[in-house]
Structures are given as structure tokens and as C-alpha cells.
Amino acid sequence: MHRIAVLTEQETRVAQMEEQIARFCKEKGRFPRIEPYRNQESFFNAVLTAAFSHAVIALPGVAGLNAVEHLRALCPACRIIWCSDLDFSLHAFRLRVDYFLLEPVTEEGFRRGLLVWLEGRTSIAPFLFDSNNH
């Protein structure tokens, strides 16, 4: 069974992302275990216990960059969607992030990231960047 971690400091945001992931997965006939985290300490303790198959990192600024770098070091095979208020798209490419979203994240943009996971694209697939400036 897939384990999807959602790491964000905002309580309302973690609930929204959990709901979006659950709805998307249900539509596709998948039922992963979704685990919310509101701080990096508890998130990384969970990673050390048992690696996640997928993770959404939605932290501001350098905190997000540090979390993605640390997660990639601990769990090289983890599939990652990274949401940031700063344009770290080059870092995301270097860190083999599956999908990078620049804030503000739209439901449509987040869904595209989830589709990348579902389609099983590898880290060598063309890098996807969503600026949400449509």
C-alpha cells in the first residue's frame, strides 16, 4: 500500500491537500494511506521509521528547500510534489522532484502533480513546473 505524507505548517492547508489527494485517488480506484504532518521533526521521525512512497512538501522559502533536500537524502526513491512561495524550480530539478508548484497552488495545478504520480513518470522524465500564472 502506498503511504503519502503531507508536510505543511498550516492546519487548513493540510486538510485541503489531504481531501484533494483522497478525492483524486478515489476517482482513480486507489486507496493510499495519507499521513499529515505539521512540523518537520515529526515528519522526519516518521521517515526514519518507515519510508514514504510519496510526499507533498508545502513549506515556505528555505524551509521547504531544506525539507526536500533532507527527504531526498533519507529516501531516494520517494516521489515528491513540492509547493513553494519561492522559485526553486532548478533545485527541484536537481533533487529529482516529480512536480514543482509555485504558490499560489491551484486545485488544477495540484491535480496535474498527482497525475504525474499516477502515470508513474520517472525522475528522468521531462521536468514539470507549474507557475499557476494562466
Language-model regions, residue ranges each:
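Non-catalytic signal-transmission and effector/linker regions of two-component phosphorelay proteins
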Residues: 1-5, 9, 15-18, 124-134
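Two-component/phosphorelay signaling modules centered on CheY-like receiver
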Residues: 11-35
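Acidic, metal-coordinating helix/loop segments flanking the phosphotransfer/catalytic sites
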Residues: 36-53
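A short, hydrophobic beta-strand element within the central beta-sheet of small alpha/beta folds
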Residues: 56-57, 77-87
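Short amphipathic alpha-helix used as the core "switch/output" element in two-component signaling
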Residues: 63-77
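A Lys-centered signature of the CheY-like receiver
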Residues: 103
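CheY-like receiver
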Residues: 107, 111-134
